[in-house]
Swiss-Prot record:
GO terms for molecular function: 3'-phosphoadenosine 5'-phosphosulfate transmembrane transporter activity; 5'-adenylyl sulfate transmembrane transporter activity; nucleotide transmembrane transporter activity. One of its GO terms (cellular component) is mitochondrial inner membrane. It is a multi-pass membrane protein. Keywords: Membrane, Mitochondrion, Mitochondrion inner membrane, Repeat, Transmembrane, Transmembrane helix, Transport. The chain crosses the membrane at residues 24-40, 84-104, 126-143, 195-213, 237-254, 297-316. One of its GO terms (biological process) is adenine nucleotide transport. This is Uncharacterized mitochondrial carrier YPR011C. PANTHER family: SOLUTE CARRIER FAMILY 25. Solcar repeats lie at residues 20-107, 120-219, 231-322. It is found in: Mitochondrion inner membrane. It comes from Saccharomyces cerevisiae (strain ATCC 204508 / S288c).
Length: 326
């Protein structure tokens, strides 16, 4: 305790602490994740509703009509339901990704990321991105599970209304849901329900996101140094949007599986699906819903992912530069 107070009393010590590469990556990554997810929270809510509903419920009328429906039924608060928990989850989730990625750069591949002349190969980028994606999932998955369940607790899903999940007049809070899931669904096994399909989606998504962004950034690094800051920031926004869109489109079917496995215990039969494994889910969706079933909610997700990834990369770069130049 005395050591902490001593550090707080010495501004230079705080600066030196924050300017360590791992701490810069943690702080910038966490802030970037929280800001970017808040910006697109309404699309995140609607995307989850589209993913877990049956084909006959009212949220099938389109992205913006679904957003309007949520607003009319639940108000502005409904558009951001679960976002507080999402920010609590996304700060360490995003921070862990950037810390592990930077650690892979410097410790594993001995590349100085601040030197524009030193770059990872595409294979190294994919490996580092996959590793940081896996670490972030394991570290924060229970919060992701609870966030998904909170998102659909108050939704007007007629099939879910008939299940036990809607038998209460007031939705449970974060800690109540965590406690109930742990107690009623097998302890840690319940809290990590769906972690396998989640990892199958997140690991390649993060790998592609980092690899595409860094490759595009490398293309523009020489010209962007001489450009005004607004042009450089616009370029970062653009390539961030591209990297997120490409990665999400390729890996989206696994994101759909992730959400469905997360809500199985809330009334999967009533929602119209029940799976015994990832392979069973893939086969069942293909037979019952066709190829389009694998991409249900993709449009809403792209409305979320493209601006979210763009903002995330830009905020990360800006915070990193600000702390380094402090």
């Amino acid at each position: 305790m005395a050591e902490v107070l001593t550090v707080l009393e010495q501004p230079n010590s705080i600066k030196d602490f924050l300017k360590q590469d791992s701490n810069i990556a943690f702080l910038a990554g966490g802030v970037a994740g929280a800001v970017s997810r808040t910006v697109v929270s309404p699309f995140e809510r609607v995307k989850i509703l589209l993913q877990v509903q049956s084909s006959t419920t009212s949220y099938n009328r389109g992205i913006f009509s679904s957003i309007r429906q949520v607003y009319h039924e639940e108000g502005t608060k409904g558009l951001f339901r679960g976002n507080g928990l999402n920010c609590i989850r996304i700060f360490p989730y995003s921070a862990v990704q950037f810390v592990v990625y930077e650690a892979c750069k410097k410790k594993l591949f001995h590349v100085n990321g601040n030197n524009g002349q030193e770059q990872l190969t595409n294979t190294q980028r994919l490996f580092s991105g996959a590793l940081c994606g896996g670490c972030s999932v394991v570290a924060t998955y229970p919060l992701d599970l609870i966030k998904t369940r909170l998102s659909i607790q108050t939704a007007n899903l007629s099939s879910l209304n008939r299940s036990k999940a809607k038998s209460i007049s007031k939705p449970p809070g974060i800690w109540q849901l965590l406690s109930e899931t742990y107690r009623l669904e097998g302890g840690l096994r319940g809290l990590y329900r769906g972690v396998w399909p989640t990892s199958l989606g997140v690991v390649p998504y993060v790998a592609l996101n980092f690899a595409v962004y860094e490759q595009l950034r490398e293309f523009g690094v020489n010209s962007s140094d001489a450009q005004p800051s607004w042009k450089s920031n616009l370029y970062k926004l653009t390539i961030g949007a591209i990297s997120g869109g490409v990665a999400q489109t390729i890996t989206y079917p696994f994101d759909l599986l992730r959400r469905r496995f997360q809500v199985l215990a809330m009334g999967g039969n009533e929602l119209g699906f029940r799976y015994t494994s990832v392979w069973d889910a893939l086969v069942t969706i293909g037979r019952a819903e066709g190829v389009s079933g694998y991409y249900k909610g993709l449009a809403a997700n792209l409305f979320k992912v493209v601006p979210s990834t763009a903002v995330s990369w830009l905020v990360y770069e800006v915070v990193c530069d600000s702390v380094r130049n402090w």
